[in-house]
Amino acid sequence: MANIKSAIKRIQTAERNRLRNKSYKSAVKTLTKKCLQAIEQYAAAPSADAQAEAQKYLSATYSKIDKAVKRGVYHHNTAARKKARLAKEFKQATGQVAA
């Protein structure tokens, strides 16, 4: 453990930031899994409801990724890569460009 007051504060700050970052990353991963699952369900049995569900999860995932970038959890290129991969999956399943 650090003895210097400023070092102790930095340790506390780093831990707080680590937990915040972990929360955002976990939420992005969860939404990504739900989005991919919805896309797979649409691919297996195409319907308007299934497509709307996939679009809903895609939008929610995009939003969470963008918020993580805004808060410095992800680099903007990492976020762009994640979003592009999701859009590619969506386009392959639906034949539409993700909005």
Swiss-Prot record:
Tell me if Metal-binding is a UniProt keyword of this record. no
InterPro entries tied to this protein: Ribosomal_bS20, Ribosomal_bS20_sf
Enumerate the Pfam families for this protein: Ribosomal_S20p (PF01649)
Provide GO CC annotations from the record: cytosol; small ribosomal subunit
Give one GO biological process term.
Answer: translation
Decide whether keyword Flavoprotein is in the record: no
| MF annotations from Gene Ontology | small ribosomal subunit rRNA binding; structural constituent of ribosome
Entry keywords, A to Z: Ribonucleoprotein, Ribosomal protein, RNA-binding, rRNA-binding
What family classification does the UniProt entry report for this protein?
Belongs to the bacterial ribosomal protein bS20 family.
User: Record's HAMAP family?
Assistant: Ribosomal_bS20
Chain's role: Binds directly to 16S ribosomal RNA.
Question: Could you tell me what this protein is called?
Answer: Small ribosomal subunit protein bS20
Source organism of the structure:
Picosynechococcus sp. (strain ATCC 27264 / PCC 7002 / PR-6) (Agmenellum quadruplicatum)
- Taxonomic lineage per UniProt? Bacteria, Bacillati, Cyanobacteriota, Cyanophyceae, Oscillatoriophycideae
Q: Which gene encodes it?
A: rpsT
